[in-house]
């Protein structure tokens, strides 16, 4: 069985031993399950949202980056109209018949996601076809680093390479993933997760024009100014929070409607203040205030990166985290307000950061559950990992690097 070239693995992962073993395992299982003697290999990373919390779905701006955890796949066309995917660690095979795509046939789970993506690809003018795949991931599931978007971008890369001559853009990838989540999962997600996983590296995104998303890569790494990103899984997963996620864009769009526009990026905070007393939903007002402040902070953060002003950059991330906690209110769910794993872990982290006099922390990604992000001095990384592990377990603490390469066909 063919395997990816070591030079390509070195380029993506910065090493070949661990990654080589992962792809060897992938190849062996793919051959064993599907009887194939050749394969093509693909990778799509998870993502970290650095600043721009819950702004993408209302046309705002985000700085995000792909991370050094990824979903990998061995795949090959099977000459039919049936997609068959085996995911490492899961007993049931994912089977999707391309001749029977409908939400009534695929109602839940990963099969629904794949079916939705195929329908989304077709509706956007792209070809689909049957293939077999064996996939494996080390992206933390249901924790806010976009395990689902990583999987989606892997599948997009597969169908792009096999059936579309690699002509799909990252924007196309994101639309396909968003369609599947919106229509088949009833989740009102934006496109940030998909774009960050697809593009790779640290990136500034502008979501004002959904059909022509603008993005620019940033010359940035936390190590460049002596810090390290640590993702902490707080102990409660994202699996049952679709309503909470959907309420945020819904409430923001309701405010936008009062202001005479469709999305908040089309208006400004002055218009909100002028109409504030007409809006009965106080939380919606607070969330709109977060949007305007957060979009401005993203612009300032990009400027700080450009001028190597990392003190200002960290200050803006700190402000962003406070706004998410106080205005956006996505650190815990009102359905179970006694369980506050996010706020608990933030508070414990703040005690550590105050003691050392450096670093910031914030809720990470969609929120309500899952992970927080702590940005700590490199010299304090081990101390922080040891400290926070007392409360969440060392297996839930992940020092991260930003990976330069996004969703790609490896060879």
Q: Predicted regions span which residues?
A:
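Phosphate-handling active-site elements
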Residues: 123-132, 159-173, 378-391
């Amino acid at each position: 069985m063919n395997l990816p070239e070591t030079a390509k693995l070195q380029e993506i992962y910065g090493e070949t031993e661990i990654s080589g073993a992962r792809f060897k395992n992938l190849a062996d299982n793919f051959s064993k399950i599907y009887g194939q003697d050749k394969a093509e290999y693909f990778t799509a990373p998870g993502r970290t949202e650095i600043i721009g919390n819950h702004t993408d779905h209302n046309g705002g701006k985000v700085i995000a980056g792909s991370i050094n955890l990824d979903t990998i796949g061995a795949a090959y066309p099977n000459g039919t109209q049936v997609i068959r995917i085996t995911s490492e660690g899961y007993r049931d095979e994912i089977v999707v018949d391309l001749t029977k795509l409908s939400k009534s046939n695929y109602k839940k789970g990963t099969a629904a996601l794949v079916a939705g993506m195929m329908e989304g690809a077709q509706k956007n003018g792209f070809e689909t076809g049957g293939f077999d795949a064996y996939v494996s991931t080390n992206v933390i599931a249901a924790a806010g680093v976009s395990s689902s978007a990583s999987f989606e971008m892997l599948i997009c890369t597969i169908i792009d390479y096999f059936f579309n001559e690699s002509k799909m853009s990252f924007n196309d990838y994101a639309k396909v993933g968003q369609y599947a989540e919106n229509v088949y999962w009833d989740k009102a997600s934006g496109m940030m997760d998909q774009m960050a996983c697809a593009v790779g590296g640290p990136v500034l995104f502008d979501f004002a024009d959904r059909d022509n998303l603008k993005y620019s890569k940033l010359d940035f790494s936390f190590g460049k100014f002596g810090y390290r990103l640590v993702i902490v899984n707080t102990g409660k997963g994202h699996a049952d929070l679709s309503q909470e996620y959907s309420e945020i864009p819904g409430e923001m769009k309701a405010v936008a409607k009062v202001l005479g526009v469709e999305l908040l990026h089309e208006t400004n905070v002055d218009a909100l203040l002028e109409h504030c007393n007409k809006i009965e939903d106080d939380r919606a007002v607070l969330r709109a205030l977060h949007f305007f402040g957060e979009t401005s902070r993203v612009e300032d953060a990009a400027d700080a990166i450009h001028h190597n002003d990392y003190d200002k950059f960290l200050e803006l991330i700190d402000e962003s985290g406070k706004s998410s906690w106080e205005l956006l209110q996505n650190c815990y769910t009102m359905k179970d307000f006694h369980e506050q794993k996010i706020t608990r872990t933030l508070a414990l982290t703040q005690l550590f950061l105050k003691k050392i006099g450096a670093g910031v922390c914030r809720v990470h990604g969609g929120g309500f559950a899952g992970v927080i992000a702590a940005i700590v001095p490199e010299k304090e990384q081990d101390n922080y990992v040891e400290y926070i592990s007392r409360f969440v377990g060392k297996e839930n603490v992940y020092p991260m690097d930003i990976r330069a390469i996004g969703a790609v066909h490896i060879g």
